[in-house]
Curated annotation (Swiss-Prot):
Enzyme Commission numbers on file: 4.98.1.1
NCBIfam families, sorted: hemH
SUPFAM superfamilies the UniProt entry points to: Chelatase (SSF53800), Chlorophyll a-b binding protein (SSF103511)
Family annotation (Pfam families): Ferrochelatase
PROSITE patterns tied to this protein: FERROCHELATASE
Pathway membership: Porphyrin-containing compound metabolism; protoheme biosynthesis; protoheme from protoporphyrin-IX: step 1/1
PANTHER family xrefs: FERROCHELATASE, FERROCHELATASE, MITOCHONDRIAL
Protein name, as recorded: Ferrochelatase
Name of encoding gene: hemH
Organism: Prochlorococcus marinus (strain SARG / CCMP1375 / SS120)
């Protein structure tokens, strides 16, 4: 009987306060997070930024209990999915591969090989494809496969995106309906979808499908909610978690909250549309930062739809995805990791100088300039960063 390995890919997160610095270092060491024209500066800059941001990030994690629950929740999702698949007669074992913290992708691959798995289904826990999330994880897995002859022997099927999965849409709709029903004026409550943002250049210059998939997903969810409740709620779609000086997808969530308050919205339901697990961006950014902004701008009832986590209907939807992947047309790892031809991401040593910032998260030229300035400030022990208290 075929032994199927289901590889769940996610971002990862620091589980303890002392893990925050190393986690940030891993994150910013990824050349797809910070784009630099010279690879030699990647790790020094990652060290500098992670050192600079560590204190603020530690405070954020302290506010949610001292660490990210992402690993614990993802492992719970893996166990529930494994059980659901075995109940369908599929001999499956689930594995977790985090991009920037434990358990890393390398560890999951070693476990898969040790368990004598015959076929692997790769399922990113990002419903919407982006070259910086699912794409980065697919390419990391491909990199590991290229240097591992034993891993190359395994059949690998990939699920690239699943924003329109029936179980996912239905789960989101049910959770939204629960919050609407708890409002004093259900049909007057405003729904604010908030998705993790990406740089505008990813979409407009690099052809990233992320924005289109997010928009289509929101429409599917709203349609499901309207059919269930029998009335329509007004809604907006916004983007959060912007990092760095580059323009990201708009509108930004914090600005939308201010505008909604100014327009007289009193009951607000915030829906984290691109997150399937509770983590720092739901528990701290939305529940603390955004809630404060909303209340300060006249919104009285601020409600946040909980993340899907192990919601049974959602887990069943994931099982549907895996079953369909095993029986349907195969999408190889190479196909899943493939980028639009105009995107320059790999290999890093081929990046060129210039002023076109296609597919950049941070503009490499600006980052290089800032790095040089910061380096000299560290050497001389004086400057603007010392003046404002960052150094």
């Amino acid at each position: 009987m075929t032994r199927v390995g289901v590889l769940l890919m996610n971002l990862g997160g620091p589980e303890r306060i002392k893990d925050v610095g190393p986690f940030l270092y891993n994150l910013f060491s990824d050349p797809e997070i910070i784009r630099l024209p010279l690879p030699i500066f990647q790790k020094p800059l990652a060290w500098f930024i992670s050192t600079l941001r560590s204190s603020k990030s530690q405070k954020a994690y302290q506010a949610i209990g001292g660490g990210s629950p992402l690993r614990r929740i993802t492992e719970q999702q893996a166990r529930e999915l494994q059980s659901a698949l075995r109940n369908r007669g599929i001999n499956a074992t689930s594995y977790v591969a985090m991009r920037y913290w434990h358990p890393f992708t390398e560890s999951a691959v070693e476990d898969i090989k040790a368990d004598n798995i015959n076929e692997v289904v790769v399922l990113p826990l990002y419903p919407h494809f982006s070259i910086s999330t699912s794409g980065s994880s697919f390419r990391e897995l491909r990199r590991l496969r290229e240097v591992d002859k034993e891993f190359q022997k395994l059949s690998i099927r990939c699920i690239r995106s699943w924003f329109d999965n029936t179980g996912y849409i239905a789960s989101m709709a049910e959770l939204i309906e629960q919050e609407i029903s708890s409002c004093e004026s259900p049909n007057a409550a405003h729904i604010c979808f908030t998705a993790h943002g990406v740089p505008k250049s990813y979409v407009e210059e690099a052809g990233d499908p992320y924005k289109d998939e997010i928009q289509d997903c929101a429409l599917l969810i709203i349609d499901k909610v309207e059919k269930s409740l029998g009335f329509s709620n007004s809604y907006t779609l916004s983007y959060q978690s912007r990092v760095g000086p580059e323009e990201w997808l708009k509108p930004y969530t914090e600005e939308v909250l201010e505008e909604l308050g100014a327009n007289g919205v009193k009951e607000l339901i915030v829906v984290p549309i691109s997150f399937v697990s509770e983590h720092i961006e739901t528990l701290q950014e939305i529940d603390i930062e955004y809630k404060k902004i909303a209340l300060n701008n006249g919104i009285i009832n601020f409600r946040r739809v909980k993340a899907l986590d192990t919601y049974p209907l959602f887990i069943n939807g994931l099982a549907d995805l895996v079953a369909s992947c095993l029986s349907g047309p195969e999408i190889s790892l190479d196909e899943a990791a493939k980028l639009p031809e105009k995107v320059k991401l790999y290999p890093q040593e081929k990046w060129q100088w210039g002023w076109n910032n296609s597919a950049e998260v941070w503009n490499g030229r600006v980052a290089m300039f800032v790095f040089i300035i910061c380096f000299f400030e560290l050497v001389i022990g004086n400057g603007p960063l010392h003046y404002i208290g960052l150094l």
